[in-house]
Amino acid sequence: MAIFTLTSELHDEKAVASATWDFLKSLRQASTTEWMGEDPYLFMGNDYTEYGTHAIDIIYVRTGGTEGIFKGMLPELSKKSKRPFYLLTSGKSNSLAASMEILSFLRQQGIKGEIIHGKADFIARRIDTLAKVGKARRELNGTQLGIIGKPSDWLIASDVDREKVKETLGISLIDIPMQELLDVMATIPLREVDENPTEENIKKALPGANQIYDALKVIIERHHLQGFTIRCFDLLTAVHNTGCLALARLNAEGIVAGCEGDIPTMLTMKIAQSLVGVTGFQANPSAIDPETGELLFAHCTIPFNMVERYEYDTHFESGIGVGIRGYMKEGPVTIFKTSGDLSRHFIAQGNLVRNQALPGLCRTQQVIQLEDPAIANYFLNDPIGNHHVILPGHHAPLIQSFIEQP
């Protein structure tokens, strides 16, 4: 993250510089984010040549009397970046007053901005959040996500606005025929597996499940994909197997791998991965208690890097192939979903209170207690499709900041 400065010539530069280093030092000390030993703050001073090229660019309004200077710089800065202007203030030398005048001017021009002001720990947290959001948006820009086969027929409310996705996120959606995957599978021999499950039907299905994984790796490399969603139920009839094992592995390897050709959920998973480092558990709400806010989510696959342990079972609906029953660590979780046109978002925090393995449901089952029970009404009154993404940890403020920052 880069720190640029705005300073009036009327102020003594030596005194202002000393106060600047003390202020930035307090922010570094207050930051709780790990930046791999690097100084998170890149001090650029009054050289704005590289403005707009970092995960986040912050203008430190060091003194009053800078309003006119900023107004003169605005046309050039607006060419360099279309993101909001972030004005950092220290509370000294009329810094806050000048920032308020600048922000008011920006609002009059229809330009977004924010004043970052408060105690050192608050400022550090806000800057860390904005930096993570900026880093995520840079990572998403240029991403290619595949749609292998068409969305499943039952996903009647899961259309996507491809132009909006490209414009807003920088993500390109690539259509890949299911037959291409099947053709690749035909060239890949079955291989022995290390696992030795006791159930004979699962033991017989594992080589085929691994073949699906190997073929998907070929498709990913061929089309330069960072993720995909697959019309996985077609595999049941085409090869008498399932993609659950392959998706669990690929998600753990950092490749977004979604089920049922659900494009909005794939986008949700990719956004989540860019922000928190995991793709998430794509799942259906299977039961809801609107009075207590307790929800049951279930699906037949979950990323291996999200669970403490897992078991093999058959795929629930078909009773064939290899499904995954994963057990995630109990504790804080976030439920997230974005719509296909990116106009709506759902974010809720809760706690995973137990994993279960009841018959009659998809194999991985999670019971989640919402922090706010009233939010359960969203699922019954105004849901964004059926699939939602479960993330370990509480991330609502970070995700909300991503949504609010263009």
What label would you give each PLM region?
Residues M1-M44, S401:
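N-terminal basic/disordered segments at the start of proteins
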